[in-house]
Amino acid sequence: MKKLKIALLQICPCNTLDENLKKGIEFCRKAKERGADIALFPEMWSNGYNIYERPVHAWLAEAIDADSDFVNAFGKLARELDMAIGITFLEKYADSARNTMILFDRFGDNKFTYAKVHTCDFSVESNLTPGEDFYTAELDTHCGMVRIGAMICFDREFPESARILMLRGAEVILVPNACPMEINRLSQLRGRAYENMTAIATCNYPASVPDCNGASTVFDGVAYLPHDMDCSRDTCILQADGSEGIFVAELDLEQLRRYRSSEVHGNAFRRPEKYSALTETKINEPFIRLDRRK
């Protein structure tokens, strides 16, 4: 089996929706030229996650429909290029907006629409409507069928996000991002991949974008190889620098599947009957926050 090629579009946003559309299309075409099976954008590409230091009404006015020309253009492009695309945008949603990603398969079909569940309610994202759930879907690629899931930026701070996606069969988790990927956040991703035996691909904005630093990554989730079980390996198969560009990782699906079928993590030895505290909703000190969404 050929390796699954995931292209992380670590690129700078422009000033308008139309400019971001044109640049997004340009870089998807470049990703296809490099053999990508999946192209992933950073968080909220439609407006470059430009929601800070601005009046809330100004950036909420930039929300677009999930069925907008901007979004549909990437569905058509996915079909033209024979390449899956994870496009991100500020979605108009009822009287509010959501932080959303749509995964189009290589035939241009919408496999799922995911809205960020863990909105940053301690900041301006408190004005967004959170997503309702985590989703996975079977993605038809040139490597065969692959079950894909997604979470967005702050979602990765919570182990439950990746855990639920693993329980729903995700082999690969796509993570659009817009924040500094420093050592602790990178360690989170490494841990999520390790404990779930799941590949995790994160696409961030480059260092030229305020409060971002590039460092997009792919962790393949395989901590040990069959012929070398005494020595662990680094699961990071790609880490970008801070520059703008397309960073392509080649994921060995056969290796990942062999590992998942025999190793001890993921759902192999869990004891969910012991985890009832995870679903309790009462919050005690020191974790009470007045700005937490009810």
Report residues per predicted region.
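Short polar catalytic/cofactor-binding loops
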Residues: 10-17
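Extreme N-terminal starter segment of soluble prokaryotic enzymes
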Residues: 1-7
